[in-house]
Amino acid sequence: MPAVDRDDDVWVAHEYNRGMTSIDMRSAVLTAHPSTPNDDVRSLAVQLRAEEPDILVFQYSLVADMSRVRVPLSGAGGRADALWEHTCFEAFVAAGDAPGYHEFNFSPSLDWAIYRFSAYREGMSHAEIGRAPEISVGQRDDGLELESAVRLGHLADLRDVRHLRIALAAVIEDGDGRLSYWGLRHPPGKPDFHHPNGFALELVR
């Protein structure tokens, strides 16, 4: 599939009023990487909105034959690694032109992970965060929705940063255990959510 690069699919905010309590944004449509198609998925969209000065809310909407999608069992929720080995929703957030960024993983199991990178796939560490993301999940026969609210104010590299670059992605596991990789923009070659070209959304607040 071609990389998504259309004005109606990529939302760019040029102004943000810190006095506002929320901003609603248009949905961004994710596409499967050409090497990992999944015909059981009809669509996968993400809505990103800002609430208060330092909260980002990610809402992922998957439309699919859920009998053919493996979803991790829901639990108490907590920090966990390797969530991308199964169905998982992801976001990558960078501050302005800085080489470093944060990776956010949200699982339908309610588990989560936040990693800090000093540069492209370098210096990976667990990000220190004062409060876990607030995750909610709803599932039906023909789809799944996951919403996660992240408090950027608890992340030193992103606190009070006016210009953010954001990449959106997801991993969907089918009934046979195969993984398909979904993103807003795919670089050439194999799936790579960390690639700088994937940071297709900009938020100026």
Question: What are these model-predicted stretches?
Answer:
Residues G78-P133:
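Extracellular/luminal beta-rich ligand-recognition
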